[in-house]
C-alpha cells in the first residue's frame, strides 16, 4: 500500500524544521490562518510533483534568509520501504530515491501518488483546458508506463516544429517533425481516450454517493486536440500548414486536448451550484483514486487543504467515510479540530501548528 510513514522538511516557507510521523488514515493539521498549514500540504505536493500549487516561482518556497530547502519522505509501496528526497537552491534541484540520484521528477512522482484538493480545485471546471489536461495526464502517467515517454517525444517534436515555424524555415525542414509529432499524438490519444472510458463508471458511482439529489449521470467527453471531423491528424497538419506558418505555432495536437463534463447534455459548470461543483471535483478525484488502486493494487495519498472551506459538515463526513472505505491515507488542514469528524481514531493523528511550529495532540 502507498503511505507516507514519515515526512521531514527544512527551510520551507515559514517552517524552519518539522518532522511528522503519519497515521494510516486521517492526519489532521489544525491552526490559524497563516500559521503554516497550507505550507505543509504544499511541501508534500512539491516532493511528489516537483512544483508548487501556489507559485510558479520556486525560489519563493525557500525560507527567507536561507539558501536551500530540503524535503524528505519515508514511504511504503507494495510492502517495500522507500526514501525519497528533494533539495532546492535558487538555481538547482537535487532528487534522490533510496540514496541514489533520481534522473527525473517522474521517477519521484511514480513513488508518491498524491492527489490534491484545495479551495481552488473547482476551477478545474471554470478555467481553460490546461487543468483538465493535467488531471487526465496524472491518471495516464500512473496507468500506462508508455505515456510519459510518448509525452516527452511529443513535446520535443512540437517544440522543434514551432521553432521552425517561427523562423519561417523551408517547408521541407518543418515537415520533418510532422511524422514524429503524429506518431506520438496518435498513441497519446489512444491512451487518453481509454483512460477516460475507464474513469467514467467510477465518476458516476461517486457522484451518486456525494450528490444523490442529481438523478442523471455525468458524461465525460474527451477531445483529442483536433477536430473529430478531420480525416486524420496527419492530414490536418498538412491542410493547416500555411496557417501554422503564418501564426508561428502548431494550432492542433495533443497539447490542445480537453475533457468536457456534462449532465444530460448540459455543461456541468452551467447546471451545478458552486457547492455541487466542489463535490463534483471530489467525485473526480475519488474516481481517479479508485481506478489507480484497481490498476496498481495500491491506494493514492490525498492532500486536502482547508476542508471546511470546501464542504459543509454533512458532505465532509461523507467524503471522509469514502476515503476510509478506500483505505486512502488523507492529510487535511483545518482552522478548528471540531470541524473534522474523526471516524477511525486508531488510524488518526492530529497536530496543531503555530508560527510554523508543530505540536502533536494526544
UniProtKB/Swiss-Prot annotation:
One of its GO terms (biological process) is DNA replication. GO terms for molecular function: ATP binding; single-stranded DNA binding. It comes from Hydrogenovibrio crunogenus (strain DSM 25203 / XCL-2) (Thiomicrospira crunogena). Its main location: cytoplasm. This is DNA replication and repair protein RecF. PROSITE patterns: RECF_1, RECF_2. ATP binds at residues 31-38. One of its GO terms (cellular component) is cytoplasm. The RecF protein is involved in DNA metabolism; it is required for DNA replication and normal SOS inducibility. RecF binds preferentially to single-stranded, linear DNA. It also seems to bind ATP. It is found in: Cytoplasm. HAMAP family: RecF. SUPFAM superfamilies: P-loop containing nucleoside triphosphate hydrolases.
Amino acid at each position: 500500500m502507498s503511505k507516507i510513514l514519515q515526512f521531514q522538511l527544512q527551510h520551507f516557507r515559514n517552517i524552519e524544521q518539522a518532522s511528522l510521523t503519519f497515521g494510516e488514515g486521517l492526519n489532521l493539521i489544525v491552526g490559524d490562518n497563516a500559521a503554516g498549514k497550507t505550507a505543509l500540504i504544499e511541501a508534500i505536493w512539491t516532493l511528489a510533483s516537483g512544483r508548487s500549487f501556489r507559485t510558479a516561482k520556486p525560489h519563493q518556497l525557500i525560507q527567507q534568509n536561507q539558501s536551500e530547502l530540503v524535503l524528505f519522505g519515508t514511504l511504503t509501496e507494495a510492502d517495500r520501504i522507500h526514501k525519497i528526497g528533494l533539495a532546492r537552491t535558487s538555481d538547482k534541484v537535487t532528487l534522490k530515491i533510496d540514496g541514489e540520484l533520481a534522473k527525473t521528477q517522474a521517477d519521484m512522482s511514480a513513488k508518491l501518488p498524491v492527489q490534491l484538493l484545495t479551495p481552488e480545485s473547482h476551477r478545474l471546471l471554470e478555467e481553460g483546458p490546461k487543468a483538465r489536461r493535467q488531471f487526465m495526464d496524472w491518471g495516464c502517467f500512473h496507468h500506462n508506463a508508455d505515456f510519459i515517454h510518448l509525452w516527452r517525444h511529443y513535446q520535443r517534436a512540437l517544440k522543434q516544429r514551432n521553432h521552425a515555424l517561427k523562423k519561417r524555415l523551408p517547408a521541407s525542414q518543418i515537415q520533418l517533425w510532422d511524422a514524429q509529432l503524429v506518431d506520438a499524438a496518435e498513441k497519446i490519444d489512444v491512451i487518453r481516450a481509454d483512460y477516460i472510458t475507464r474513469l467514467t463508471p467510477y465518476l458516476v458511482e461517486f457522484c451518486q454517493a456525494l450528490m444523490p439529489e442529481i438523478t442523471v449521470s455525468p458524461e465525460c467527453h474527451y477531445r483529442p486536440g483536433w477536430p473529430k471531423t478531420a480525416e486524420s491528424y496527419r492530414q490536418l497538419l498538412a491542410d493547416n500548414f500555411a496557417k501554422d506558418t503564418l501564426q508561428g505555432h502548431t494550432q492542433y495536437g495533443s497539447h490542445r486536448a480537453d475533457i468536457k463534463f456534462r449532465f444530460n447534455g448540459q455543461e456541468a459548470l452551467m447546471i451545478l451550484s458552486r457547492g455541487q461543483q466542489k463535490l463534483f471535483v471530489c467525485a473526480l478525484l475519488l474516481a481517479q483514486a479508485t481506478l489507480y488502486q484497481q490498476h496498481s493494487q495500491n491506494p493514492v495519498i490525498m492532500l486536502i487543504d482547508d476542508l471546511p472551506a470546501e464542504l459543509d459538515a454533512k458532505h465532509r463526513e461523507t467524503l471522509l467515510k469514502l476515503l476510509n472505505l478506500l483505505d486512502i491515507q488523507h492529510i487535511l488542514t483545518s482552522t478548528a479540530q471540531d470541524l473534522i469528524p474523526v471516524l477511525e481514531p486508531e488510524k488518526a493523528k492530529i497536530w496543531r501548528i503555530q508560527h510554523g511550529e508543530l505540536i502533536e495532540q494526544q
